[in-house]
Amino acid sequence: MMNSFVVDNSVVMSWCFNDEANKYGDAVLGRLAESTAIVPPIWPLEVVNVLLVAERRNRLKQVDSVRFITLLSQLPIVVEHEGPERQMKDLLSLGRANNLSSYDAAYLDLAMRNDCPIATLDKKLIEAAENVDVTILKF
């Protein structure tokens, strides 16, 4: 995908919580004015899980979660869907080779297949991306 990048949930959720806001996350958000972010099918579930946990811990009110989901729906973030058979085989192999969770492997696999950079704050994912020659989105 031309002018696209993969964004992982560590970056996306930094947009939700004031105490997690950072310059990198803000720069990635700004980049969406001119680019499209792509995410794996697991991404919406990850977002919702973080919001539910935050609500239960009184970090967020329900209205804040709804507001954040509304914001995300207005951004050029595309969920890429793919058949599970290829995905399971490739993610298992990629996760093993790079000591990643299946979730992180899904983001890395997406960047590899689309030949695009990845935006992440996750140190293990950054290291794995560098190991397989995936560019880290930098500013």
Which residues are covered by each model-predicted region?
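Alpha-helix capping/helix-boundary segments
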Residues: 11-12, 43, 86, 107, ...
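Acidic, PIN/NYN-like endoribonuclease modules and their adjacent C-terminal/linker elements
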Residues: 2-4, 108-139
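Active-site-proximal, substrate-binding regions of enzyme catalytic domains
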Residues: 48-78, 88-90
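Active-site neighborhoods of divalent-metal-dependent phosphate/nucleic-acid chemistry enzymes
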Residues: 77-117, 121
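Short, well-structured N-terminal submotif of metal-dependent ribonuclease cores
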Residues: 1-42, 54, 58-66, 132
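Phosphate- and divalent-cation-binding pockets in alpha/beta enzyme and binding domains
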Residues: 24, 46, 90, 127-128
